[in-house]
Amino acid sequence: NDVMLIVEQAQDWWWFWGNDELDETTNIHSFDIAEGGQTTYAGSGRINGTVLDQFCLSEFEGEIRVASTTGQWNRWWMADPEPMENHVYILEQTQDSAGNNTLEEVGHLGGIAQNERIWSARFVGEMAYIVTFEQIDPLWVIDLSNSSTPTILGELEVPGVSTYIHPLGGGHLLTIGIGPSNADGTGLDWSKTQLSLFNASNATDPTLESVIGLSPVIDTDDGWSWGYSEATYEHKAFQYWEADGLLAIPMSIQGYYSDTKEIDGRLYYASGYEYISKLMLINAK
């Protein structure tokens, strides 16, 4: 609560056009907000790759931890772009020879999940939890207790992908995301919202304790339905009451229906759309 981090792309969006040698980098600026009504600049640093969201950032005991993705997957004109891979950087505030405040890299773990990108991340104390995805979702459990040598302790592959990670304590994680599209657990079906409960208390052997799918919700034999939850991309729509172990998330369902009826020997056909908003309550102890 005493540190504010601001992240920006180090280059304008067009900077790499026509130059395949340059890679994306990210600037990180740290500010001390411990004193009420006052903000003090603490230092800046730069890492390789791009940062997904605020949960890929963390400050813990004076160190800045960042999860990023590198690669040239968005350069469609290249015949052989660099593959994606993921990283965890640990930065520490220091001063350079000119006396300027900087954030210096003191630890780095690279090569995580080649050809995949980060879909969600969460730093909890001396641990980091990262979800990557290509065809199936690996959950990575990373030990940050030694800043100079962050280490992968465990990995678990599960169907679908988690887009938000909510720590429950004791190494348990409650996640929301997208369910798989294929029977073998691969791919993504964007009409399926999926909740998962992980147990990573044994960091070297994380397990999936429970999973539940929430959509589509409309059951119909003469049409189709499609549903999603805003909580899959907006964490403020994910509300968890720890005392009762109760999760509340919104659901939006869209359905198409059609029907044919015979009245006085004539056939009448009707079709249309239904839009339903629901608040889903889930026992997630």
Residue ranges and their predicted role:
Residues 1-285:
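Feature marking well-ordered beta-strand scaffolds used for ligand recognition
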